Amino acid sequence: IHPVRYPATATANATVTDRSTPGWSAVGTNRLGETTIHVMFWLERMVPRPDDAIRTSYEHPLSAGLVGDRLVAYESVTGQQGYVWRTVWESPAEAREFHDGYLRLLRFRVGGDRLAPAAEGPGKRYVIRSGPFADAFRVRLDGDTVTIVNAPSVDGLETLHAPSG
């Protein structure tokens, strides 16, 4: 995507510490990468698509600047699913751009309602009450890192990945 940056630009090893309660188990891990982030925003029409064809460069400010990510998928003993997705960016400004774009996606593209701040820890919490994305989300910006927790319910956010403080 950015050939002039390689090999000079280092990648980050994004890690996700397991902070789930005994009712949840990690069932898989993967990296999504800049292309997946671009397509996520493109599908929700947050990236310009003048001819409705994705630009082959995949370059956009909402996804540029990613240096590493890790998604850990979880399943509960009752069969519910969720994930923790940590993204690391070149700078706090790049992280803020992705963070703010993701919050816009939750609010305006998939109908998320912002909840009051949680007493349990930092991060903005959203709930999508119906539709294909019906779930709860906690999105935390910390310097050059954005962590997204997805669970079937608001309570599930805390049991799947307890806030770090």
PLM-predicted stretches and their roles:
Residues 1-165:
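Beta/coil-rich, acidic/histidine-enriched accessory regions frequently appended to metallopeptidases
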